[in-house]
From Swiss-Prot:
Marked site: Transition state stabilizer: 20, 27
Keyword Transcription in annotation: no
Known catalytic reactions: 2-C-methyl-D-erythritol 4-phosphate + CTP + H(+) = 4-CDP-2-C-methyl-D-erythritol + diphosphate
Natural source organism: Pseudomonas entomophila (strain L48)
Function recorded in the entry: Catalyzes the formation of 4-diphosphocytidyl-2-C-methyl-D-erythritol from CTP and 2-C-methyl-D-erythritol 4-phosphate (MEP).
UniProt protein name: 2-C-methyl-D-erythritol 4-phosphate cytidylyltransferase
Gene from which the chain derives: ispD
GO molecular function, one term: 2-C-methyl-D-erythritol 4-phosphate cytidylyltransferase activity
Lineage: Bacteria, Pseudomonadati, Pseudomonadota, Gammaproteobacteria, Pseudomonadales
Entry's family note: Belongs to the IspD/TarI cytidylyltransferase family. IspD subfamily.
Pfam family, one: IspD
Length: 235
């Protein structure tokens, strides 16, 4: 039996500068396999038949976005980037609301610098969360031994990794629920590191959907080098 996947909007917060990459431009605009990291991050969504549209949150003075081929794609809309990730995502949700999107619509938020999302992971997320009352996120169980550090930089404790997961993206929630959670967090000055943390703060428990560990976020130069080696000859 063929599973019908739910329609969804994709939101890509792409206003960050990626200081840890120490590059001459924001990391999402670095080259990987013939196009930018951001374009790769968009591709998996643009190729999906259940996509309703994409909103990319871009800094107002961003000189790189207009030069991308995808910037003229009619399925992609641009929202203003904010000071923090949560501001950028909220601006994208406000744009969707203003254009008539429903509170019940699914929204998938994905990192601009996470270019190796597998179609199978995207379909798995959509399938497993289609009827979920809260939503959830792609994640990977922790594999390495984890240490908690003290203020002196020494090991304070070893963390039980059996219940620890690494949060990945996309993170999938209803538009209305995510909008309210992010807005309340910002008003209350709550630190929001990802969309799931806002939903958690609002009193909900997002579901963890196990994904591939190679769906990495490019944060440091060695991340990009790893992807370049992996993709060598792929395109």
């Amino acid at each position: 039996m063929t599973t019908v996947l739910p329609a969804f909007w994709a939101v890509i917060p792409a206003a960050g500068i990626g200081a840890r990459m120490a590059a001459d431009r924001p990391k999402q605009y670095l080259q990987l396999g013939g196009q930018t990291i951001l374009e790769h991050s968009l591709d998996c969504f643009l190729d999906h038949s259940a996509l309703k549209g994409v909103v990319v949150s871009i800094a107002e003075d961003d000189p790189y976005w207009p030069g991308l081929r995808c910037a003229s794609d009619l399925r992609i809309q641009r929202a203003p980037g904010g000071r923090e990730r949560a501001d950028s995502v909220l601006n994208a949700l406000l744009l969707l609301h203003a254009q008539g999107a429903s509170d019940d619509d699914w929204v998938l938020v994905h990192d601009a610098a996470r270019p190796n999302l597998a179609r199978s992971d995207l379909d798995k997320l959509l399938s497993e969360l289609a009827d979920d009352p809260v939503g959830g996120l792609l994640a990977v169980p922790a594999r390495d031994t984890l240490k908690r550090a003290g203020a002196d930089g020494r090991v304070a404790a070893t963390v039980d990794r059996s219940t620890v997961w690494q949060a990945y993206t996309p993170q999938m929630f209803r538009l209305g629920m995510l909008h309210r959670a992010l807005a309340e967090c910002l008003v209350s000055d709550v630190a929001v590191t990802d969309e799931s943390s806002a939903i958690e703060w609002a009193g909900h428990a997002p579901r963890l959907v196990e994904g591939r560990s190679d769906n990495i976020k490019v944060t440091r130069p060695e991340d990009l080098e790893w992807l370049r080696q992996r993709w060598s000859g792929r395109r």
